[in-house]
């Protein structure tokens, strides 16, 4: 059965990961050694708890972004995704030849006041039996 981690352990782990991300791994013993080198931690059990939580967080970071931890690599990746612009727009009017809709959708477009030139009405074979 596991224990609840205190906010001291969580905060210290997050700070250490943000500052020394490149030195941390999924290995508890390596993280324990890095904690000894870079931080002044009051007791051995506290150091072990922090190193254990760092190991836990590093495994989570491998799977995806973790809330509360901002790593420069993740920030750059997020910026790249947010600023992505496709070369050819899928809704570019010059690229669209025609939009195929059924009669109900056509009626809704007319009722809403949309006057789209590329709309062609197609009858659906499966809706005729209603």
From Swiss-Prot:
What is any one of the record's Gene Ontology cellular component terms?
A: ribosome
Q: Which UniProt keywords apply?
A: Ribonucleoprotein, Ribosomal protein
Single GO molecular function: structural constituent of ribosome
Task: Answer yes or no on keyword Ribosomal protein.
Answer: yes
Q: Which domain of life is it from?
A: Eukaryota
Write out the GO biological process terms: translation
Keyword Endoplasmic reticulum in the entry? The reply is no
Q: Where is this region: Disordered?
A: 74-97
What InterPro entries would the database entry show? Ribosomal_eS17, Ribosomal_eS17_CS, Ribosomal_eS17_sf
Instruction: Report biased composition (Basic and acidic residues) as residue ranges.
Output: 74-84
Q: Which family does it belong to?
A: Belongs to the eukaryotic ribosomal protein eS17 family.
Cross-referenced PANTHER family: 40S RIBOSOMAL PROTEIN S17 (PTHR10732:SF0)
Q: What is this protein called?
A: Small ribosomal subunit protein eS17
